[in-house]
A protein has these predicted regions:
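N-terminal secretory signal peptides
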Residues: 1-13, 17-28
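Terminal leader/tail segments of proteins
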Residues: 33-192
Length: 192
């Protein structure tokens, strides 16, 4: 037997061990690590964890990516009543007033509110929501009985201080009456 064939035989167990180690290392890296919550959430929802995420497309166009941050795993039943945050990262430029107007339209789908509330909330959102560019983020924090606090690119923009506003605004994405049920399932973490 030549020395080269002897080395080949001796190397097989070593090779197998190396392949097993490599497979274990690669397998471990394929497990998705829990992403860190945005900095603005550290004081708002200190134990924030990513419950779910998705992407909104309209007529095939990528509009935004959205992530729902919760303190613990949340069921669909309690989605609108828990302090949590929705982070929207825009994939295209949009006008702030149009974002506010679309929000009101979607809130109407979720529940009822007066024309007085509509005018007040629309005015507040038009002040809070800037024109956005690709990569800009608007994060809404559901403060339940206090309303919703908004951050734009990590900086506090202001808040809508009305407990009735919070479940309607978050309901745009999390209510069973949402216009985007597939996106809701992705945010709740129940999508197949």
């Amino acid at each position: 037997m030549s020395s080269s064939s002897r080395c080949a035989k001796l190397d097989r167990p070593t090779r197998r061990l190396a392949l097993v180690a490599l497979a274990a290392a690669l397998g471990g890296s394929c497990v998705a690590a829990q992403p860190a919550a945005p900095a603005e959430l550290r004081s708002e929802v200190p134990t924030a964890r990513l419950q779910g995420h998705g992407q909104l497309r309209f007529l095939g166009l990528h509009v935004y990516d959205i992530r729902w941050w919760t303190p613990t795993a949340v069921s669909a039943h309690e989605a609108l009543s828990v302090e949590s945050a929705l982070e929207i990262e825009y994939a295209r430029a949009l006008k702030g007033p149009l974002i506010a107007e679309r929000s009101i339209k979607e809130m109407r789908r979720v529940g009822e509110f007066s024309v007085v509330d509509e005018a007040r909330w629309l005015g507040q959102m038009k002040q809070l929501f800037p024109d956005v560019q690709t990569g800009d983020r608007i994060t809404g924090v559901n403060r339940r009985s206090e309303g919703v606090r908004f951050y734009v690119n990590g900086r506090l923009a202001g808040e809508v201080r009305d407990a009735a506003f919070a479940p309607l605004f978050f309901g745009i994405w999390l209510s069973p009456r949402t216009s985007e049920p597939k996106l809701r399932a992705e945010l709740l973490g129940t999508a197949p």
